[in-house]
Each structure stands twice: as C-alpha cells, then as structure tokens.
C-alpha cells in the first residue's frame, strides 16, 4: 500500500506523496502569492495613435539595492517595431506576436488608452528591464518608442510605471519559511 497525500483545501495548494513518503501530518500557511510584474504607460488618445518605431529589448532579472541582475535562464528578447506597426495597437500586437515572455494589452482607464506590459512568469527573478533603440535618435526621452523604457535600477530611466511588483510566494511549512517564484 502506498502513502497518499490529501489537503483540506485543494483551492490553496496541491500535494503529492512519493513511494518513500512516511505517514504524518504537516501544516501549511500561505503568506503571499507570487506575482508577475506589470507596467503601464502614460495615456494615449486612441489605439491608432502613432507612437514610434525602432527596437524594444526586454530583459528579465532581479532588482536589488539599486542594481539589476540578469536572469541567466532567460535570454533578452528584441522586438522590431516598424513604421507600419508603430501605433499603440501595433506595438501591442508586435509584442504579443514576438512571444517574448511578456503579454501586452491596452487598458482604457477613462482618460485615455494605456499599454500594459506584464511578465508571463511570477517571481522576483522575472522582473522586467525594457530598453529601446528609438528611431527618433533618443533612447530614453519620453517621446517615440522610448515612452516604453523601464529600468528601476539606480540611474535608470523609467517612462513606464510599475502597477504590480514582481514577487515570490511565501509560505510556512511546519514552521519553516519558504519563498518560491
């Protein structure tokens, strides 16, 4: 007979037992859920508003003490925004079609349209750093494609605003604190 694992509330977590499991009881207390980072742009009048062209580069990593450390498991992703897809909607579509580890959506907040970029993966090591090569020649001003730069490290330029911080889940199993993406 094998050992089975059960949990009192299967909506909170899943459990399993290996053949080497020893019968017993454990406590699980969930402190916080893992979150993926979400960033929003300034407002645009319409989804057809021309923003700019160039290249968006998305990197994943961890921000700590004013420094960005790359996530070695994820390569940087570059997305070319051509003049033909340089509207707000075109940029959203180009980001989504690139399958670059993020999703892009447009939210109407009542005062305009905002581009929202979200990491597909949760955890502090999946925070975003977005840089541009902007066709207007200035890669960090608040016009053209550089309206979508984000670098929360010391001295970095961020024209996007963070709405949800990348965070790990934290929980306690039998009195032991654990943090996981």
What residues fall within each predicted segment?
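N-terminal, intrinsically disordered, small/polar-rich Type III/flagellar export signal
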Residues: 1-181
């Amino acid at each position: 007979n094998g050992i089975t694992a059960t949990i009192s509330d299967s909506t909170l977590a899943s459990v399993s037992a290996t053949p080497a499991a020893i019968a017993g009881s454990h406590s699980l207390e969930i402190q916080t859920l893992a979150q993926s980072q979400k960033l929003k742009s300034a407002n645009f009048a319409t989804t057809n508003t021309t923003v700019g062209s160039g290249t968006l580069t998305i990197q994943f990593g961890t921000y700590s003490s004013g420094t960005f450390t790359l996530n070695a498991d994820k390569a940087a992703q570059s997305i070319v925004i051509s003049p033909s897809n340089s509207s707000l909607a075109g940029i959203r579509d180009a980001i989504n079609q690139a399958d670059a580890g993020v999703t892009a959506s447009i939210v109407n907040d009542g005062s305009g349209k905002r581009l929202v970029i979200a990491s597909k993966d949760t955890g502090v090591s999946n925070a975003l750093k977005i840089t541009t090569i902007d066709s207007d020649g200035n890669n960090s001003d608040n016009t053209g494609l550089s309206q979508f730069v984000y670098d929360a490290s010391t001295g970095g330029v961020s024209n996007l605003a963070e709405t949800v911080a990348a965070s790990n889940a934290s929980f306690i199993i039998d009195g032991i604190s654990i943090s996981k993406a």
